[in-house]
């Protein structure tokens, strides 16, 4: 419980520029922090977007279902009707080559899931072979409401061709 209190205090301080004891005159800054408060303009946009959330998630799911059914790879996301699919990932043998070929055809891909233990902040001497192998192979393909039917067909066709 003592640790929980310390963690809570640390998180509260980080949320407001690292400042502790914000209500008193004897505040201090013990760590680097940020200002995570949302301004009114961003909040207004967020409220409007929230009204569209179900519709947008359904579009993501529709695209993901097509990918799950039509992309001919053994290792890809399995369709789950409860997932929002803000990203859709696949595993390819040569990620760099796959991304270059897709880019030449006008399809943006991404690498969103680099293994955490390889970042400087978390760097350790631990070897996680499976995590590292997946980290070198995972790539995301477009899965957003701006895609039209021909975009989706092209992504499926070229993913099957280049993977």
Q: Model-found features: residue ranges?
A:
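PLP-dependent aminotransferase class I/II
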Residues: 3-163
């Amino acid at each position: 419980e003592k640790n929980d209190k310390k963690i809570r205090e640390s998180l509260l301080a980080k949320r407001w520029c690292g400042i502790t004891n914000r209500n008193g005159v004897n505040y201090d800054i013990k760590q680097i922090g940020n200002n995570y408060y949302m301004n009114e303009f961003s909040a207004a946009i967020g409220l409007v977007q929230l009204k569209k959330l179900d519709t947008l998630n359904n579009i993501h799911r529709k695209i993901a279902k097509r990918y799950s059914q039509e992309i001919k790879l053994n290792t890809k996301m399995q369709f789950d009707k409860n997932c929002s699919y803000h990203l859709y990932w696949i595993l390819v043998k040569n990620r760099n080559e796959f991304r270059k070929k897709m880019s030449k055809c006008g399809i943006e891909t991404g690498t969103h899931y680099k293994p955490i233990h390889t970042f400087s902040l978390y760097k350790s001497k631990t070897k996680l072979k499976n995590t590292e192998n997946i980290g070198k192979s995972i790539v995301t393909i477009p899965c957003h409401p701006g895609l039209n039917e021909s975009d989706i067909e092209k992504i499926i066709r070229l993913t099957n061709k280049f993977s």
